[in-house]
Regions:
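Short, cationic-aromatic polyanion-contact patches
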Residues: 1-7, 22, 54-72
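Short amphipathic alpha-helical interface segments
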Residues: 6-19
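A short acidic, leucine-rich amphipathic alpha-helix
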Residues: 25-27
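Key DNA-contact positions within bacterial/archaeal DNA-binding proteins
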Residues: 35
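Short, hydrophobic-biased segments on the C-terminal half of alpha helices
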Residues: 41-42
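A short, conserved structural fragment
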Residues: 45-55
């Protein structure tokens, strides 16, 4: 699957979520390996398209607008 397609699938998945999704949740939803999802999520974070928060052992991800709505 091309990288742009993975990014688009991740963003579409996160748009549907009202609460944070873990890297594992994202990977399962778009049918890729955990580390593939993690790499793309980190890239999207660097592009300021998603926000990241570590809670215990989980990496949690939101779209920026959903994060701002719940965390401010």
């Amino acid at each position: 699957m091309p990288a742009d397609e993975i990014d688009e699938k991740i963003l579409n998945y996160l748009k549907k979520q009202q609460w944070p999704a873990t890297s594992e949740d994202v990977a399962k939803a778009i049918n890729v390996q955990w580390h593939t999802a993690q790499i793309h999520l980190m890239k999207l974070m660097a592009e300021e398209k998603v926000k990241f928060r570590r809670v215990g052992r989980q990496n949690q991800w939101w779209l920026n607008k959903i994060y701002d709505k719940h965390m401010k």
